[in-house]
Amino acid sequence: MMYLGVDIGSSSSKVAIMNDRDEIVATSVVNLGTGSNAYETAMDEAFETAGITSADIAYTVVTGYGRVRFPEADKQITEITCHAKGVSFLMKGIRTIIDIGGQDAKVIKLKDDGSVENFVMNEKCAAGTGRFMEVMARVLGCELSELSGLADKADKEISISNVCTVFAESEVISRLAAGETSENVARGAHLAIAKRVMGMCGRVG
């Protein structure tokens, strides 16, 4: 028997297929998000990799920002619960999970048995999320995947003071116009994310 897990996120859809021996036999990630049928494409890719069809799936669980788009699933589970179960399955003994998604960020504290003890989410729009980093990459004229490499070349630390993504974008544009380097701004963006996540870690206990 095969089991299907689908995560319909705000910026991408992820699929994993597991057999009855608890082995992950196929995965797929499609970067399109909830406004499309990206999860169907991801499922097709995973089915092809595993050499199976939907008829071979015994049970399906869906999670994520857009999980309501897949009502055919046998069960819908929150991202918080899925994070806890997935991390506990892959790495025993983990007590803290940090998830920086496209639209929100979460810090999850686990109990000794791997269940959720507490969690906190970001409070200010897209601040501290993947969307914030996407905006920073766009302003700096690079791909999101290139942002960390750019930050590694910084020669000083700068602070991005605005917590709102819209205002932070304006602040970064002003700094660049004033002569600040893209490398230093990229590092500042990473530091801004890190500080916000660390604040969440403090609140989760």
Task: For the regions a language model picked out, list residue spans one by one.
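Phosphate/pyrophosphate-binding loops at sites that engage ATP/ADP/AMP, CoA/4′-phosphopantetheine
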Residues: 43-58, 197-205
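Adenine-nucleotide phosphate-binding core of ATP-dependent small-molecule kinases
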Residues: 170-201
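Short beta-strand-loop/turn "lid" adjacent to the catalytic site in phosphate-handling enzymes
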Residues: 26-32, 50-81, 108, 117
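Short glycine-rich, Thr/Ser-proximal phosphate-binding strand/loop in the N-terminal lobe
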Residues: 3-41, 45, 116-119, 123-124
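A short acidic Gly-Thr/Ser loop motif
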Residues: 7-11, 65, 100-104
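Short glycine-aspartate micro-motif
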Residues: 3-7, 57-61, 95-98
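Glycine-rich phosphate-binding loop plus the immediately following alpha-helix
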Residues: 28, 113-156
